[in-house]
Amino acid sequence: MSIRNIGIMAHIDAGKTTTTERIIYYTGKSHKIGDVDSGNTITDWMPQEQERGITISSAAITCHWKDCQINIIDTPGHVDFTAEVERSLRVLDGGVVIFSAVDGIQAQTETVWKQSEKYEIPRLAYINKMDRLGANFFKVVGDIENKFKTIPLILQIPIGNESNFEGVVDIILNKELHFAMENGIPKLTYSPIREEFAEKVGFFKKKLIDILSQFSEEITQLFLEDKEISLDIIKSEIRRGTISRFIIPVLMGTSLKNIGIEPLIDSIVDYLPSPFEKNFSAFSLDANKKILVNPNENKKLSALVFKVQYSSVIAAHLYFVRVYSGEINSSKKIFNASNGKREKFTKIFRVFSNKNEQIDCVKTGDIGAVLGLKFSFTGDTLVEENNNVLLESVTFPEPVVLMSVEPERSSDEVRLREIFGIISKEDPTFSYYESKETGQLIISGMGELHLEIILTRIKDEFNLNVYTGKPQVSYRESAGKIVKEVFEFNNIFAGKNIDFKIGMIIKPLPRGEGNKIDFECDINPTIKSAIFRGITTAFVSGVFGYPIIDINVGIFSIVSETSKISESAFESISGFAFHSIFQKSDPIKLEPIMLLEIRTPIEHTGEIISKFNVMGGVIHSVSNIGEYDLIKSEAAFEKLFGYASILRSSTKGRGSFTMEFSYFKEKVG
């Protein structure tokens, strides 16, 4: 059976979950249609999701259409949960990007588009909410072309618009598609194209052939010879153009009213790639270089852990895996190539949102979940022994908001730490630590909503009440200048007198470069590894108590007058040395700058811009969508606490905004 691993991506409220619920219904996986407003969707199964009507965790669903197995991941649209999108995209072969026919391209749409570009994911575009006031299919298509510098391939034209939208004309099939409820069951019917649509269909059919002929010699030849271009050839070339990311097929519908779903599922099967149509990149530990590997069931196992999810029912973590070669089964001896630990699968599951069906194996190209892993995390590579490859891992954005947390009862502090450990294992953008100054437990995340959801989980899922402080900005720090020095340690460590010198040079790097450690002298590999760990650990907290970023540390000399220094001593002393030298680099504090997209009624635009300027924000652009203006801007994160209340007050509750982290900037004053 053929497989499609696809993601459903969009801005919040564009209709991701509603569309996914319809796909689940039409493929026969569910006998009722879940509704976001009613809180009974299959994919949004967490209590916090059903209560808020948003997707928080990327739910995995397996369903079938015709002769194809479709693994669907419905991803969050809120920027606070962008890590869920990132780790899902890493294992997808194709995607459906949903656009609102009214709002067009929105902030998170741009974010997920960029993320999917990074992973070179072929996509379909589905323009939803065609029945809404202000819906404009062709404007959104134009925006996709201009904003994303891609070639949209229109496969359908609308029958009616806004409240009169009733179906589509399929340009390839030359048929009208109508969608109606019959005895309470959605039913698709086909009819010949009416004369009123003939000219428009002819125009877009010619445009479709023109686009395909740009990369298809076969279609070009048939066109020049004035021969018929068969349906099979057209669909085959659309598929080829989609997989090569030369084109983006565009469909439409209104998912809430069950219009456009079956053609969308057909297009997922017809145009998006199977796992066997693309080689995957890996790092060969034997050859010490990147390689391309062909997916093959007969090869040894290589799989990626792309998500870890805690189940309070079984009090254990469930590990979601994508298999790139070989197969997962409980008899295999497994090795975690990322950390060198041996692992074992105890149970294997086919996933259906929050419900699991136990199975015997997960084969090449498929997605499943396993129990039994003890030392694995998101982004780790699982292999059979002697298959020395590392798959490309998953990278995540920096947390930008902090909050102090303490249990109502001091006796619960150990349990609270355990809960934080459980959550941080499943959510790489959540972290916690103990403040050196106050002794308080500090949690950090992607935004206020992110931390709010986690605190709700602690109360509802783990039955623990906590006190919290006000949200604070998660600053960073970096070196202000180059400093070069030899640090001398002559003291007792672990009961032994140690005389040790280490020379370091610390240089500031451009923003976004990350931290680098270079060894400019010959060092024993064991000592080198210990020093690397010591300095890396020291990056966690600098002079101001914040993580250190964007510096280069060069080790240019090591002199030891003491024999047989332990690894732990090298590790600890290297950390001391780094902190001592870093203090002399004129450290600077960095604050997060956020990108905002503010949606406001036109009559309030002037007031919104004025107040935003007073806050020290910068306006990048203002564009109009019907009765609303979209203001794209940026501001320091510390100025944005409480901005939702300011916006609601200024717009009489009609305004809204989204924001995402952009970059770190030196904080002045």
From Swiss-Prot:
Belongs to the TRAFAC class translation factor GTPase superfamily. Classic translation factor GTPase family. EF-G/EF-2 subfamily. Residues 1-276 form the tr-type G domain. One of its GO terms (cellular component) is cytoplasm. One of its GO terms (molecular function) is GTPase activity. GTP binds at residues 10-17, 74-78, 128-131. Its main location: cytoplasm. This is Elongation factor G 2. One of its GO terms (biological process) is ribosome disassembly. It is found in: Cytoplasm. Pfam families: EF-G_D2, EFG_C, EFG_III, EFG_IV, GTP_EFTU. Keywords: Cytoplasm, Elongation factor, GTP-binding, Nucleotide-binding, Protein biosynthesis. InterPro entries: EF-G-like_DII (IPR053905), EFG_II (IPR041095), EFG_III (IPR009022), EFG_III/V (IPR035647), EFG_V (IPR035649), EFG_V-like (IPR000640), G_TR_CS (IPR031157), P-loop_NTPase (IPR027417). PANTHER family: RIBOSOME-RELEASING FACTOR 2, MITOCHONDRIAL, TRANSLATION ELONGATION FACTOR G-RELATED. PROSITE patterns: G_TR_1, G_TR_2. The keyword Thylakoid does not apply. Catalyzes the GTP-dependent ribosomal translocation step during translation elongation. During this step, the ribosome changes from the pre-translocational (PRE) to the post-translocational (POST) state as the newly formed A-site-bound peptidyl-tRNA and P-site-bound deacylated tRNA move to the P and E sites, respectively. Catalyzes the coordinated movement of the two tRNA molecules, the mRNA and conformational changes in the ribosome.
